């Protein structure tokens, strides 16, 4: 792929390269890692509307690829196409196109709107071929082996394509861009109840979900949060940590498995535009449910599920209320190539595990569901042979390719229009300490609360931060004054001690004076607090040593 030198951001529309913070903040925040180190040492469209456009002045508009001059996709353009001429099932998605129904090793050629063949794939054992990366020069390669060139080529851009197969040419199909969304009725007609189920994406792929309500469905609606990742958020009866805590505090929770993971269909890849678009679709479909309070949802999650929130929010789902990402990165490429040196440590291991778990039956619980008769889960495993080995793929990208701008969070977070609560530790042993590069990229007119601290990867769920997290979700998702009941505190002490080794609990109910109904007053007091808060010397408390919680807090505007 056409590569740019590491760190060259001028051609991405960032004048003078990447900047982090206003000068007034920069001098003090730059010193924080040194001080901490010493302490440790001692909107949705409709079928007729035009495609959703980026706002004027959007710095990433040219990297959110859409088919030029085309209206929003019609219902007929969405989902699988049973093509009469070729006899194939052709599924155009967001910067992807999947073909099924061919014979093993049969040649499946993709041609552009000019009638030129741009890539030929040999179908896998199941008669499948998946187009996502296109070489500069037409080639014929075996599908599903991840051996497409990674230096000379590009992604599959949105637009009109056709498939050639067996001497026949298919009808036109439309590959979508992230911002080319389905109509409101597509989301409104989907129904989800308490428990396990599936939600349908704009390309017809189904993602597995697990809904957990805090009470009977008829007693709703409930404030609702979504946790979206490639781990096991939709595994029945085993919620991820963010969902578990939110459920304890009275929220309805929905765990959603990314495409190509768990029981979800589709081809897995790491943070690609299709995955971002799926997040939009999932948010809109979930928010349309009758049991969702205000028909808006928030998002929660740490690490993988935290990073995913930033990508999803950048697609601007109209019914997303707020996000609370924790322990995040600023760019997948730089995570794999920090300082231009290949990361053979955690990132390599993490990508290898993602590849393994995205294999058919790779998470064990999906196999259990198939054995119990879940035919949708079983059918969704068939396409897994087309999954890309992203570890090998990314290792070949020694230089930053321009097409990777679609995953560069420093370019995407300016598009986020919802309130954001973001936390991270400078010594994060897994995702690293680059997350502050995101801070000044957020829209200054949108509410944000950033908390930085010295500490480890899971500390976002520690007592030091979890009460702040709950306060944010209460104000911006639930629309309620935060108030943690005594019963919840009594039940939580042992959980915190088990996970953090220290006898701690939730913080005080800071807005109790505003109960029961002075919501506006409580929220005004919360909003008036500093947007950037640095928690200094966490773990240095002598009662006992290691207790999470700062000795000093530095506030920045």
For each predicted feature, which ranges?
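Cap/lid segment of the alpha/beta-hydrolase catalytic domain
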Residues: 192, 197, 216-288
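N-terminal cap/lid segment of alpha/beta-hydrolase-fold proteins
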Residues: 177-220
């Amino acid at each position: 792929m056409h590569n740019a030198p590491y760190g060259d951001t001028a051609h991405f529309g960032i004048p003078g390269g990447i900047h982090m913070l206003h000068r007034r903040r920069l001098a003090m925040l730059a010193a924080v890692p040194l001080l901490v180190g010493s302490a440790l040492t001692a909107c949705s469209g409709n079928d007729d509307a035009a495609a959703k456009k980026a706002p004027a002045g959007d710095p990433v508009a040219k990297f959110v690829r859409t088919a030029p001059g085309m209206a929003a996709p019609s219902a007929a353009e969405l989902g699988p196409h049973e093509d009469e001429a070729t006899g194939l099932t052709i599924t155009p998605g967001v910067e992807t196109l999947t073909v099924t129904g061919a014979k093993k090793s049969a040649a499946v050629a993709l041609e552009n709107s000019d009638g030129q063949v741009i890539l030929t794939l040999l179908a896998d054992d199941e008669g499948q071929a998946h187009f996502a990366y296109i070489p500069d020069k037409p080639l014929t390669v075996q599908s599903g082996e991840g051996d497409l060139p990674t230096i000379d080529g590009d992604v599959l851009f949105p637009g009109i394509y056709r498939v050639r197969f067996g001497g026949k040419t298919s009808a036109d199909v439309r590959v979508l861009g992230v911002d080319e969304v389905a109509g409101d009725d597509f989301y409104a007609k989907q129904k989800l109840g308490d428990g396990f189920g599936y939600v349908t994406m704009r390309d017809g792929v189904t993602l597995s979900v697990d809904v957990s309500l805090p009470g009977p469905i008829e007693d709703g609606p409930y404030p609702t949060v979504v946790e979206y990742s490639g781990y096991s958020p939709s595994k029945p009866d085993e919620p991820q940590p963010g969902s578990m805590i939110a459920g304890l505090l009275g929220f309805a929770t929905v765990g959603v498995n990314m495409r190509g993971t768990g029981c979800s269909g589709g081809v897995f890849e790491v943070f690609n535009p299709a995955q971002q678009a799926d997040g939009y679709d999932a948010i809109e479909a979930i928010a349309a449910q009758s049991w969702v309070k205000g028909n808006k949802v928030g998002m929660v999650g740490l690490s993988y599920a935290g990073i995913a929130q930033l990508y999803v929010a950048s697609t601007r789902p109209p019914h997303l209320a707020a996000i609370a990402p924790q322990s995040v990165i600023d760019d997948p490429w730089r995570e794999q190539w920090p300082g231009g040196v290949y990361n053979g440590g955690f990132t390599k291991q993490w990508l290898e595990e993602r590849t393994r778990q995205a294999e058919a039956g790779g998470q064990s619980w999906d196999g259990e569901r198939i054995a119990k008769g879940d035919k949708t889960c079983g059918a969704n495993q068939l396409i897994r042979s087309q999954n890309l080995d992203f570890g090998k793929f990314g290792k070949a990208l020694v230089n930053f390719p321009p097409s990777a701008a679609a995953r560069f969070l420093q370019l995407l977070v300016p598009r986020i229009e919802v309130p954001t609560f973001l936390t991270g530790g400078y010594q994060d042993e897994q995702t690293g300490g680059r997350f502050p590069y995101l801070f000044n990229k957020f829209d200054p007119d949108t509410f944000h609360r950033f908390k930085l601290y010295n500490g480890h990867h899971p500390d976002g769920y520690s007592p030091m931060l979890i009460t702040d997290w709950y306060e944010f979700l209460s104000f911006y998702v639930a629309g309620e004054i935060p108030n943690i009941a005594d019963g919840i505190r009594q039940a939580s002490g042992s959980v915190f001690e088990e996970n953090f080794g220290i006898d701690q609990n939730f913080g005080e109910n800071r807005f109790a004076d505003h109960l029961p109904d002075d919501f506006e007053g409580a929220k005004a007091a919360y909003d008036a607090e500093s947007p950037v808060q640095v928690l200094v010397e966490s773990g240095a408390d002598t009662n006992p040593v290691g207790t999470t919680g700062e000795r000093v807090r530095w506030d920045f505007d």
